[in-house]
Amino acid sequence: MRNTFAALALASTALLVGCGDDDDDMTPDAGTTYNPTGTGPGTSLRCTSSNKNAWDTFGANAFVAVNKSIVAKTLAEVGGPKGTTNLGESFTHIGDASKGPAYADDAATFEGKLAAFLVYAYGGPESITYADGKMYTGPQNMAAAHVGMAITASQYDYFIANMVVPALTDNGVTAADVSSCFAPIVTDAAFKASIVGK
């Protein structure tokens, strides 16, 4: 699960790079005094509610809450009656290095890496100190993080639609902001391809 999130994070980064404008410096956006915090791929995306990127709109507490919600929803699904039917087995092997390097991180590290990736990808700083008190780096290689997981396109789509989007909306992100400043990264074909089938 941790590696899937890492993969998601990396894929999101790749997508954001592809979707971003060329304004990677820290100068204010044209016609505004808004100076984005980060330099990640989603820095140039703008939320409908604020005309700022997701990180600058929602902040650290919201990102932690959404991240924890994604993890909780995913673990509840694979541990519940549906089991691995929709998400596959990748989340059931977190912390089991015998399944391959993509699974080596324990659950806490997986969660921290996912959070750092999401923060960076959506316009925040390149590294964060997470709720566990440890420092995590956001820029990650999604393809490498998902090697051996054999995630299918339908599993990926299910994860985004049934774990990620509800985690966002349950934590106060409007549908308009999901569409404007979160979805472009995870729905990008190149980002998805960096995770699926590895």
Task: List each model region and its residues.
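Bacterial N-terminal signal peptides that target proteins for export
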Residues: 1-8
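Repetitive helical segments and hydrophobic/amphipathic motifs
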Residues: 11-12
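Bacterial signal peptide processing site
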Residues: 20-22
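Core of compact, soluble alpha-helical bundle domains
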Residues: 26-198
